[in-house]
Amino acid sequence: ISSTMCHELSHICGFMREDEANFISYLACYNSDNTELRYSGAMMGLIHATNRLYRYDPNAWQEIYTLLPEGVLRDLAANSRYWKKYETPVGETADRWNDAYLKANDQTDGVQSYGRMVDLLIAFYRAQGLI
């Protein structure tokens, strides 16, 4: 929830693109003195990065997944259960509306733009010399 709050606050500050809002949220959490806020940002980054990895290389995703600590696995499972509730016809319609809304507002990737924050994460860590 903390990373979502930071994401929405970044929109209020004028960053309308979803990938930018996610990345700003990650940075805000990453730079926080609050352990829970840092964890929330790390989880958001992990979810987006591993979702993208799964699309491109399910075997690499599985390798990484087996290395995650039990507490992280529990939190990921809870996150999946939460979002599973919205996999309904109404939820799918809302996703289509959100996709159309984003595209109408010059975010040509629509809902796919949320995950593009992974590109920004990679650039950030490259600039830091960490990858």
Locations of regions flagged by a protein language model:
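Short, mixed-charge, low-aromatic patches
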Residues: 1-5, 53-54, 74-79
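Active-site recognition of the HExxH zinc-binding catalytic motif
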Residues: 1-15, 19-22, 26
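Acidic/histidine-rich catalytic neighborhood
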Residues: 42-67
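Post-HEXXH active-site segment of zinc metalloproteases
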Residues: 17-44
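Pan-zinc metallopeptidase signature
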Residues: 70-131
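Sec-exported extracytoplasmic/periplasmic mature domains
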Residues: 10, 14, 26-33, 51-58
